[in-house]
């Protein structure tokens, strides 16, 4: 959890926002996935948001669903994902690592065991996409017991009560949705979220990172101008992987270029 606090403190001192890429662990293969993650970090990623492939990802559009299918085809399991996480943490000791996943994977070996495993490999936060705040108590309790930040999604239509609850119980960062629906770079709609960010700040919530449909530097600038601490981009990155599966060198070059440009937008 402290890695997020350190990150936001360092970025504030430099007057920068955070750029956080999302990828599925093991896509398209475990070995190339580790190279991809090294490339994202070298190109300027401030933190990582990583998915554990799941067979029924309700919040994800086709791009990220296909990433999970590629990982499954490469034989990726939750066990392999945790081995990869341990390797990433060993190589990159300071970068915040967040998991974005689904409840079935948490339930599989028991909630407490799952968070213990996360702590053992150096994961900083967990966001469970299909658990609404109202049902989050057993998850957030176990998370805090093991020093893991529970991350909550703040939807664009959140009422005051929900904003207070998210501010009170969230740690690390707050995942601010650009819009309702599923993930996807092709779904551009960005709502004016200034009022939500103002309220979250008023209630002392963890810093807001805006996600869903973030695929261009200009959108990063808009998020920061609205008061967000940074932006998360997933589908646009995963699409680069999908389009270059057979040419890894080109894939890594395009990923580096994309992240460099998105990170540059956090500095203006």
UniProtKB/Swiss-Prot annotation:
What InterPro entries does this protein's entry cite? Aldolase_TIM, RibuloseP-bd_barrel, Trp_synthase_alpha_AS, Trp_synthase_suA
Its function?
Answer: The alpha subunit is responsible for the aldol cleavage of indoleglycerol phosphate to indole and glyceraldehyde 3-phosphate.
Q: Which PANTHER family match?
A: TRYPTOPHAN SYNTHASE ALPHA CHAIN, CHLOROPLASTIC (PTHR43406:SF1), TRYPTOPHAN SYNTHASE, ALPHA CHAIN (PTHR43406)
Q: Which organism is it from?
A: Yersinia enterocolitica serotype O:8 / biotype 1B (strain NCTC 13174 / 8081)
The catalytic activity, as recorded, is: (1S,2R)-1-C-(indol-3-yl)glycerol 3-phosphate + L-serine = D-glyceraldehyde 3-phosphate + L-tryptophan + H2O
Record's keyword annotation contains Electron transport = no
Source taxonomy: Bacteria, Pseudomonadati, Pseudomonadota, Gammaproteobacteria, Enterobacterales
**What NCBIfam families does its record include?**
trpA
What's the name of its gene?
trpA
Identify the pathway: Amino-acid biosynthesis; L-tryptophan biosynthesis; L-tryptophan from chorismate: step 5/5
- What EC number(s) is this enzyme filed under? 4.2.1.20
Gene3D superfamilies noted in UniProt: Aldolase class I
The stretch of residues making up the signal peptide is: none
Name of the protein in its database record: Tryptophan synthase alpha chain
Active site, per annotation: 49 (proton acceptor), 60 (proton acceptor)
Q: Which GO terms describe its molecular function?
A: tryptophan synthase activity
């Amino acid at each position: 959890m402290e890695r997020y606090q350190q990150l936001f403190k360092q970025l504030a001192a430099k007057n920068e926002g955070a750029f956080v890429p999302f990828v599925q662990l093991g896509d398209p293969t475990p070995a190339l996935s580790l190279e991809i993650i090294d490339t994202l970090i070298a190109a300027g990623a401030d933190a990582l948001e990583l998915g554990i492939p799941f067979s029924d990802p309700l919040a994800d559009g086709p791009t990220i669903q296909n990433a999970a299918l590629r990982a499954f085809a490469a034989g990726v399991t939750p066990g392999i994902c945790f081995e990869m996480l341990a390797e990433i943490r060993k190589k990159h000791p300071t970068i915040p690592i967040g998991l974005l996943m689904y409840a079935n994977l948490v339930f599989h070996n028991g909630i407490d065991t799952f968070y213990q495993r996360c702590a053992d490999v150096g994961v900083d936060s967990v966001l469970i996409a299909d658990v609404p705040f109202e049902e989050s108590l057993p998850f957030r309790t176990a998370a805090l017991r093991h020093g893991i930040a529970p991350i909550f999604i703040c939807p664009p239509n959140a009422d005051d009560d929900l904003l207070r609850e998210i501010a009170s119980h969230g740690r690390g960062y707050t995942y601010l949705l650009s819009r309702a629906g599923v993930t996807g770079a092709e779904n551009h709609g960005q709502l004016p979220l200034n009022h939500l960010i103002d309220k979250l700040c008023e209630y002392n919530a963890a810093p807001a990172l805006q996600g869903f449909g973030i695929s261009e530097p200009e959108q990063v600038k808009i998020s920061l101008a609205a008061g967000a601490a940074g932006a998360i981009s997933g589908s646009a990155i995963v699409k680069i992987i999908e389009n270059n599966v057979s040419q890894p060198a080109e894939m890594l070059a395009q990923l580096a270029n994309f992240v460099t440009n998105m990170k540059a937008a956090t500095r203006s």
